[in-house]
């Protein structure tokens, strides 16, 4: 079952705590995460949090989703994680393996006009990912067009996928970069992930030499 919750927050720093309870056994699981809601700066581009995932699922029917909201405005909002009939399932641990595909989602909130008072077209925005390890850049994606644009709200959504097979095991910081070509507007946001090292290859074992059985059920015969 997919649980979705919505709440409108004022700018500030928050700590979110999620609690899940299994009714039959009474077992409870919790997860905590810090959340920062920045102050909106008119005339400047900003990015959302960067969501990491290894799983895409078809959008569920409304009857299969429990939705909890606080306030009228949240009831009017749709899930930004749903694009083209698919939902990206965020990774809570941000721990991945090399045989997985990494799906990255984020949104750019762009101003209505550039520094020359000319309208900014959301479809012209471009975004890419840069991977850092131990402070050094080790990989980067091409700059890509948005997956979806809401021109009325000036929001461009990006969903980028890439296989993790080419990255070595370890900890990485992932930087999302968005630019508006031909303008001075750009923004970036960072998150972190851990990539598990592949399991060591099993060492070959040498079969023991054949010897007469002398264990229980077999006794040496007297000469």
Task: Report the location of each language-model feature.
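Intrinsically disordered, low-complexity terminal regions enriched in Ser/Thr/Pro/Gly
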Residues: 1-223
